[in-house]
């Protein structure tokens, strides 16, 4: 059995009582409220009376309130639409930077918070230098910064304090 998915798109403020009555009979009180009714002539007639105020779709089954809410919820996480071009001193502009070599070198030197190093390398060849921001990025100690400073040969973009 199919259903009408009816969503009140425009308010009925200032319209005749008859229009308010039709919306009440359909179960619509607030804007963007959605109700489901079976595809029957009586509901089709009501929809014709308020066709300027509602949006109607024919769907195969009713959705629960939870499913309606989940439809409005955005997808979790992030989507990389386009990677930012990066400037590396001595190399020039590159479309992609490979961090695997940097991370391997840091792990070999037993640097803690290796994941933070990937976050440290930012656009334009600059590194966040103040301690508060560095703490947010996961790089905790001055010795970590010194090790990173020694790695200019691996990735010239990473600089020490």
UniProtKB/Swiss-Prot annotation:
It is found in: Mitochondrion. GO terms for molecular function: structural constituent of ribosome. GO terms for cellular component: large ribosomal subunit; mitochondrion. Pfam families: Ribosomal_L30. Keywords: Mitochondrion, Ribonucleoprotein, Ribosomal protein. The keyword Transcription regulation does not apply. InterPro entries: Ribo_uL30_ferredoxin-like_sf (IPR036919), Ribosomal_uL30_bac-type (IPR005996), Ribosomal_uL30_CS (IPR018038), Ribosomal_uL30_ferredoxin-like (IPR016082). It comes from the Eukaryota. One of its GO terms (biological process) is translation. Disulfide bonds: none annotated. Component of the mitochondrial large ribosomal subunit (mt-LSU). Mature N.crassa 74S mitochondrial ribosomes consist of a small (37S) and a large (54S) subunit. The 37S small subunit contains a 16S ribosomal RNA (16S mt-rRNA) and 32 different proteins. The 54S large subunit contains a 23S rRNA (23S mt-rRNA) and 42 different proteins. Belongs to the universal ribosomal protein uL30 family. Component of the mitochondrial ribosome (mitoribosome), a dedicated translation machinery responsible for the synthesis of mitochondrial genome-encoded proteins, including at least some of the essential transmembrane subunits of the mitochondrial respiratory chain. The mitoribosomes are attached to the mitochondrial inner membrane and translation products are cotranslationally integrated into the membrane. This is Large ribosomal subunit protein uL30m. It comes from Neurospora crassa (strain ATCC 24698 / 74-OR23-1A / CBS 708.71 / DSM 1257 / FGSC 987). The lineage of its organism: Eukaryota, Fungi, Dikarya, Ascomycota, Pezizomycotina.
